[in-house]
Design a protein with these regions (language model features):
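C-terminal hydrophobic structural anchor segments
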Residues: 304-364
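Actinobacteria-biased recognition of intrinsically disordered, low-complexity terminal regions
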Residues: 1-19, 390-394
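Glycine-rich phosphate-binding loops that contact phosphosugars or nucleotide phosphates
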Residues: 54-199, 312, 319-323, 330-337
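Active-site phosphate/pyrophosphate-binding segments
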Residues: 18-30, 37-49, 54, 177-298, ...
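Short, small/acidic-rich helices and loops at N termini and domain boundaries
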Residues: 379-394
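A structural-propensity feature for long, helix-poor, extended segments
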Residues: 104-111, 115, 278-313, 322-329
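Glycine-rich, charge-decorated loop segments at or immediately adjacent to ligand/cofactor-binding or catalytic sites
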Residues: 138-148, 265-268, 354-358
């Protein structure tokens, strides 16, 4: 039996308050404020001193868990024009080439995540420049201080790295801009904050589901086994974040991919048992839907495969590559429709790549949170994750 979300519960303030014990929706709505505050905190901490103000030979970023996307975003933004390579590491071992000429960025909201902390400590031992982002008075801050690096403290009160993404990402983007690795200075960051504010307003809890894009998306996602697909590198990062949020926040297992590489992999799943006409040869008996089934009492008979397509804004400079990418996206969507896959699309609005990405992340973050609440779950509290930590705490 597939999950089912009654849109009435998403329009009930009491239901939302009862299940959102740690105010995840409120925290997500502060994303724009996080950007503005992080700019101020970065300037106060001396962000211009990163790597001694000199361009490093390379940049390595360590982040994981809810902040994993920080490394992915920097890699995405820097790749087109960065004069130095940017790489990602989640844990040790640190590559052998990292040394005094390189910059290592370690991100952890608590300042205690083992991977980034170990990477920062090893980088400091080798004499690399350090930029760390996380809690003040934390082990990560101490490692950075001993290495005479720059530590950007996040504002107090943040309890979840998933909901504090922009407090963690903004200093890293600003530092990369200062070093000439990408073009995303304060003007772009303030524009990003404004875009995040617009999405927070559109996705606010008291907005009815028929006008709230995140609630509407959550209702559609509820009865599916979701596959999140980005139409290119930018939305590939957004897709990875969305799949993570669906799994960790809404407790719905989700996979993700990026076009063009994942096209065959994703489309092959349309032949499987979770599509209306799929499952040929899979040992699944096909039958017509029960017209007497009550969705409130019986629930949907079987979860359907769902394709959440994240699409970029139309290109302002037409090219053959852009036309081919759009044609491939359209072909995947048509194939999904023909196979009986439930298709959902989130289209980015025009703007700087970081601004476009912010909008995509905001909408899917809110949708995953509403999906958890609609299913009667607390988006911030997972008993099984708590059990896992208890069993592995050494």
């Amino acid at each position: 039996m597939a999950p089912y979300v009654d849109e009435a519960v998403l329009n009930d303030p009491e239901h939302i308050a009862a299940h959102d014990s740690r105010d995840t929706l409120v925290a997500l709505a502060t994303a724009g404020a996080q950007v503005r505050q992080a700019i101020t905190l970065s300037r106060e901490a001396g962000i211009e001193r990163v790597a001694g103000g000199d361009r490093p030979r390379s940049v390595l970023v360590a982040s994981l868990g809810g902040s994993a996307v920080v490394a992915n975003v920097l890699e995405l933004l820097a790749e087109p024009g960065s004069p130095v390579p940017v790489s990602v590491r989640r844990n040790l071992p640190l590559p052998g080439w990292v040394g005094p000429l390189d910059l290592v960025v370690a991100v952890s909201l608590s300042g205690r995540a083992r991977g980034p902390l170990a990477v920062a400590a090893e980088a400091a031992r080798r004499g690399a420049s350090l930029l760390t982002v996380g809690a003040a008075d934390s082990p990560l801050a101490e490692v950075c201080a001993r290495a005479r690096g720059v530590h950007i403290a996040v504002a107090r009160g943040a309890t979840s790295s998933r909901a504090a993404l922009w407090s963690l990402l903004t200093p890293v983007v600003l530092a990369a801009h200062e070093l000439g690795l990408l073009e995303a200075g304060e003007a772009v960051l303030f524009e990003t904050a404004d875009r995040l504010d617009l999405h927070a307003e559109a996705c606010r809890p008291r907005s009815e589901s028929f006008v709230n894009p995140a609630k509407a998306l959550a209702i559609q996602l509820a009865e599916t086994i979701p596959v999140v697909l980005g139409d290119g590198p930018l939305n590939g990062v957004a897709a990875s974040r969305a799949a993570s949020m669906l799994s960790r926040t809404a407790r719905i297992p989700a996979t993700c991919g990026e076009l063009p590489d994942a096209a065959s992999q994703i489309v092959a799943s349309f032949d499987g048992p979770f599509t209306a006409g799929g499952g040929r040869g899979a040992g699944v008996r096909e039958s017509a839907p029960d017209i007497f089934a009550d969705p409130f009492l019986d629930g949907p008979a079987q979860p359907r495969l769902g394709l959440l397509m994240l699409r970029d804004a139309p290109s302002t400079t037409p090219s053959r590559e852009a036309d081919e990418a759009e044609a491939l996206t359209d072909a995947v969507l048509q194939t999904a429709h023909d196979a009986g896959v439930r298709v959902m699309t989130v289209l980015a609005e025009p703007g700087h790549p970081l601004v476009r990405l912010a909008g995509q992340i905001a909408q899917t973050d809110f949708a995953a949170t509403y999906l958890a609440i609609g299913l009667g779950l607390d988006p911030a509290v997972s008993p099984h994750v708590a059990d896992l930590w208890d069993r592995t705490r050494g």
